[in-house]
Amino acid sequence: MKTLLLTLLVVTIVCLDLGYTLECHNQQSSETPTTTGCSGGETNCYKKSWRDHRGYRIERGCGCPSVKKGIEINCCTTDRCNN
């Protein structure tokens, strides 16, 4: 009986994937690609892009922030989906 309960507990933990952390790219513009683990149960990655006096700019990270007019943002929900 104990073995069955232990097996059910392990299966539950594996199925629920307790402790899962979303991983997002966090490099800016044309920097070497890097990733970060998102904190606080964050469920989105974002890629924000705009043009300024320095040229075309890109920012990546965790979350899905609000942006001003003229800034394009793409939000997604899977690991490293914001490249």
Curated annotation (Swiss-Prot):
Keyword Ubl conjugation: no
Matching Gene3D superfamilies: CD59 (2.10.60.10)
Tissue expr: Expressed by the venom gland.
UniProt GO MF annotations: acetylcholine receptor inhibitor activity; ion channel regulator activity; toxin activity
Disulphide-bridged cysteine pairs: C24-C45, C38-C62, C64-C75, C76-C81
Originating organism: Naja sputatrix
Recorded GO CC terms: extracellular region
Taxonomic placement: Eukaryota, Metazoa, Chordata, Craniata, Vertebrata
Protein name as annotated: Alpha-neurotoxin NTX-1
Localization, UniProt: Secreted
Endpoints of the signal sequence: 1-21
Family: Belongs to the three-finger toxin family. Short-chain subfamily. Type I alpha-neurotoxin sub-subfamily.
Main subcellular location of this protein, as a coarse class: secreted
Key words, A-Z: Acetylcholine receptor inhibiting toxin, Disulfide bond, Ion channel impairing toxin, Neurotoxin, Postsynaptic neurotoxin, Secreted, Signal, Toxin
Function recorded in the entry: Binds to muscle nicotinic acetylcholine receptor (nAChR) and inhibit acetylcholine from binding to the receptor, thereby impairing neuromuscular transmission.
